[in-house]
Each structure stands twice: as structure tokens, then as C-alpha cells.
């Protein structure tokens, strides 16, 4: 797979291109090992320096990287015996939210998440991860199933927001989001939400109102996209960077506000740079958090979840 470089990664991309050029030349013009090693060290240093000082707008670009692991990648890398459940039993099946039953390190769980797709064809199938009412009603159905059988709920959040189309609104988009959020909050089983890329607006909250909320290091979580905020505040979507800088959408800001409980470190260069390592890190943290919640009663889980939401934004 060809590497997709972000705008701010252009200096790194230039160095990588020089390395590739020297590797090709070495096949016909002798060895350039010393030069290649020097350039690789320089690229590594530049990557470390760049990713150590990402601003919120840069993190937004990383969170949206097309090669970042998606829900289907986490399912393949972390779970076994996955059985997908489809449909909301009212209108149809929404492929923007996928979910079903699986085993996580041998234990049964219910999982669900937004799926954006990795290429043009799959992005259309999954509607770029923007769910319609059927997706949120499917999520409620899965959560009902989890509570009935006492299974933990694991959700993976990666969406720009709920789909704002006419049909979705006619079929009760706002009500479906509200019902899904309510069901998250009233679950009597352990629930953990992991924000893996974008966490956009109510479309994200609908499956992220969990007992524990985790967030990958370079993901974002906000009530509106930076472009949308810029359009509303300044009537100028080009000021998205200004909006991102002001909105407190990054993981450290959200931990400070008590919206997020824990940050999952990403490999150098972002989760897309080493997908296997990123997925493994998520699995290890999920196992720790699930173990901490597994001994609580349904009433204790509901109270702890309520307490964490009441504490959001409060000092102390």
C-alpha cells in the first residue's frame, strides 16, 4: 500500500523519496548504504520532532488519515468468532455501524463501531461512517442483547457525525441518536468506548456514552468539526485551523475536562504508521479496563457511569 503523507509531513515525504531513489540507484550504480542510513536517521528525527509538537489541526488530519485502522481492522486483529448481526428490525441495515457477537481474549462480548471504509467502493457502502437512524437502532438492539445475556459492550468510535440526509431526518435521526445515547447510559453491564479516529457530534456520542471512554493519542472528539465551527463562527470554513485550536478537541484537553478517561499511545507517526502495533495497544488497554469493571454489579456500573458524566467539566 502506497504511503499517504499529510500536508505537514511533506519534509518527511521528501526524505523518504530520496531514500527510495538511492535504493533504486544502488541496483545499478553501486551501494549507497551510508547515505541511505543517514537519510533514514534524519527522517526518523524529523518524524519524532514533528509528532512531538502536533497542534490540534494537525491531530485532526492524523485522526482522518485514510490508512488509519478502522473498525473492521480492530475486529480482525483483536477478536475471534465474530458473528455480525444486521438490521434494526424496523427499516433496514445500516453499514455505517457494524456490530455483533465475538470473543475478546476468550471471553464473550458484544461489539460495535463506525466503519468508514478504506477505498472508494467500501466508503460508499459504509457511507463514510456516517450512520443513519437504522445504525443507531441496530446499536440499541445490540446493547439490549448484551444486557439480556450479561455481556460487556465494546464500542469503537470513528465518524465525522451522523448522516444529515433528508431520508435520515424523515426516519427520526435525532430520536434514534437520543435512544442510543440513553441505552448506553442505562446499561447494567460493563461498557467501554474507544475513540479511534474522529468522534464527531451526537453521531459519536450515541455509542460513546460508556462507563469508560478511551481515546487514541492522535484522535479527536468534538461537538462539531473544525470546518463546521469555522463556518458558523466566521462564515469561513478556511479558518478550520483557528477553530480546531480553540475547541479543545484533542485527547489531553479532553482528559483534563474529564470527558475522556485514558489516552492510548500511538506508534511514532500515528496509528496508520504501524497498524498492528496500534491495534495491539488498544487490545491491551481494553483488557485492563474490562478487568477493572468486570467485578461490579449492574447498579454499581450505572452509578459509576452516571458519576463520571456528572463530573465532566467540574474542577477537582
Q: Which residues does each predicted region cover?
A:
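Short active-site-adjacent helix-start/loop capping segments
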Residues: 70-71, 119-121, 163-165
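Terminal peptide-recognition signature
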Residues: 15, 55, 111, 158, ...
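Short hinge/gating elements
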Residues: 26, 60-63, 124-128, 269-272
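Conserved catalytic cores of soluble enzyme domains
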Residues: 157-287, 295
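Glycine-rich beta-alpha loop segments
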Residues: 91-93, 99, 104-156, 174-179
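Intrinsically disordered, low-complexity segments enriched in small/flexible residues
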Residues: 1-108, 276-316
